[in-house]
C-alpha cells in the first residue's frame, strides 16, 4: 500500500481501541498514538502534584512543563512522563476514574489536540480515542468507530486487571464503565462522537484478530477508492 493514511479509531471505554490500533499500526508499519494515554498522563501528574482536578488554570500551566513520550514495548507501548516510565501507573483506578474530568477541559484538549495533529500531519498513523475522527483528525482517510456491550467491556477490563494482579469486582467495573460512558458522551468539549463518515464495528462477539482483519479490510477498500 503506497498511500500513508491517517486512521482514526474511536469508541467508548474498553471497546478494544488501543489493543486493536496497536496491532493495525504494526501490520501497516504505521506510527501508533494512544491519545487516551496522553490524557491519563496529564491526570496522573495532576494527582501526583496535588492539583485540584477541576482547576483548569493550574492544570493548563502544568502542561507548559510536561513531557509525554511513547516507546515501543510488549505487550503494551511504554509511556513516559517527564522521563519516568508510567505505563502501569496511568492504568490504576484513581487515574481511570478521574481522567474524564481532565479530558473535559478545553485548555487541556487544545494543547493535546495540537500535539496529536502535529504527529499525524504526514499520515502513516493510527490514532485512537473518543473524538479522533470527529474533532482531532476530521479529514482522516479512514475512520472506525468500535462499539461493544457494557457487559463485554466490563469482562475485558476484569480480565486485564486479574492478569495484572489487581483485585477487582465485575459489577463495580460495569458501573464505572456506565458512568464513564455518560461523562464522555455528555461533556461539552469534544464529547464521545461517531463521525458521520465513520464505519461502525461491533466487537462484542469478535476476537481481537477478527477486529484487526476487519479494519485492515476497510483500509484496503479505502486504498482501492484512491
Curated annotation (Swiss-Prot):
It comes from Pediococcus pentosaceus (strain ATCC 25745 / CCUG 21536 / LMG 10740 / 183-1w). Coiled coil: none annotated. Keywords: ATP-binding, Cytoplasm, Kinase, Nucleotide-binding, Transferase. ATP binds at residues 11-19. It catalyses: CMP + ATP = CDP + ADP; dCMP + ATP = dCDP + ADP. It comes from the Bacteria. GO terms for cellular component: cytosol. Belongs to the cytidylate kinase family. Type 1 subfamily. The gene is cmk. GO terms for molecular function: ATP binding; CMP kinase activity; dCMP kinase activity. One of its GO terms (biological process) is pyrimidine nucleotide metabolic process. InterPro entries: Cytidylate_kin, Cytidylate_kinase_dom, P-loop_NTPase. Its EC number is 2.7.4.25. The keyword DNA-binding does not apply. PANTHER family: CYTIDYLATE KINASE, CYTIDYLATE KINASE/PANTOATE-BETA-ALANINE LIGASE. Its main location: cytoplasm. This is Cytidylate kinase. It is found in: Cytoplasm.
Amino acid at each position: 500500500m503506497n498511500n500513508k493514511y491517517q486512521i482514526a479509531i474511536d469508541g467508548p471505554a474498553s471497546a478494544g481501541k488501543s489493543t486493536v490500533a496497536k496491532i493495525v499500526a504494526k501490520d501497516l508499519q504505521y506510527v501508533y498514538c494512544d491519545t487516551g494515554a496522553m490524557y491519563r498522563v496529564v491526570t496522573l501528574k495532576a494527582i501526583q502534584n496535588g492539583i485540584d482536578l477541576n482547576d483548569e488554570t493550574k492544570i493548563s500551566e502544568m502542561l507548559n512543563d510536561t513531557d509525554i513520550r511513547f516507546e515501543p514495548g510488549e505487550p503494551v507501548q511504554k509511556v513516559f512522563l517527564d522521563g519516568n516510565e508510567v505505563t502501569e501507573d496511568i492504568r490504576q483506578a484513581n487515574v481511570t476514574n478521574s481522567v474524564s474530568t481532565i479530558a473535559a477541559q478545553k485548555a487541556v484538549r487544545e494543547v493535546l489536540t495540537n500535539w496529536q495533529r502535529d504527529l499525524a500531519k504526514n499520515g502513516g498513523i493510527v490514532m485512537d480515542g473518543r473524538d479522533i475522527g470527529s474533532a482531532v483528525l476530521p479529514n482522516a482517510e479512514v475512520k472506525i468507530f468500535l462499539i461493544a456491550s457494557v457487559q463485554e467491556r466490563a469482562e475485558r477490563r476484569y480480565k486485564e486487571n486479574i492478569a495484572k494482579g489487581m483485585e477487582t469486582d465485575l459489577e463495580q467495573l460495569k458501573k464505572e464503565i456506565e458512568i464513564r460512558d455518560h461523562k464522555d458522551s455528555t461533556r461539552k468539549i469534544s464529547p464521545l462522537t461517531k463521525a458521520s463518515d465513520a464505519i461502525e464495528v461491533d466487537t462484542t462477539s469478535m476476537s481481537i484478530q477478527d477486529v484487526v482483519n476487519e479494519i485492515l479490510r476497510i483500509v484496503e477498500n479505502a486504498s482501492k477508492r484512491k
